[in-house]
């Protein structure tokens, strides 16, 4: 069985590590400083971290220096996400030297630019697919973008290698991932899939690994102690 890449999440807002429910900023619950959280993940054996710059995603402030410094100091690989939806924000993200950049679902409103970005930076880009009730929605605003499978066809043709698929209704809820949705996405593309949202127990990770996904982003379950990160690493890699 292939490994399942584990990406523990750090969401940053106002310089603090926070967690959201269903991608809503007003649900933010504050935790420790991002650097402390990152150090803990590293000490326990994490190979990747999923770093979400919420201030950029929700246009609620700026902590770009903090994000830059975290990435520069990280001894493990970083996937950066948050507000990356045009050329300016993409270039700023690329300049951080993050190993992977996740383009926001909202960027798909300018699909021509996304296609161009994929062709220019394919090895470092993933495309976020935030899905609510079967349709793509822009995180935060909830603005409907369209049918995810129609967009996947376009993005596959452009050469997209990896998607981050989030069922917004499960994000931060600890009710388990939407396996049916993930299975449909897997069948629609040959690109790699990273699951996000809902993971609450080790058996969820086992299910996702059996499906053949490339990776999984885990946030709240780690922060509230529902999953021990050391056990999660063992489940995903051994």
Region locations from a protein language model:
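Structural preference for beta-strand elements that scaffold enzyme active sites
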Residues: 5-9, 48, 77-79, 100-102, ...
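Glycine-rich, proline-tolerant flexible connector loops at the mouths of alpha/beta enzymes
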Residues: 48-66, 105, 165-174
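N-terminal beta-alpha supersecondary unit
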Residues: 17-61
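Short, acidic/polar
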Residues: 30-41, 86-91, 143-154, 205
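Catalytic cores of alpha/beta
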Residues: 74, 78-100, 180-215
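Conserved anion-binding
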Residues: 13-26, 98-171
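Charged helix-capping and loop-helix junction motifs
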Residues: 61-68, 141-150, 175-183
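Glycine-rich phosphate-binding active-site loops on the catalytic face of alpha/beta enzymes
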Residues: 92-113, 169, 197-201, 211-231
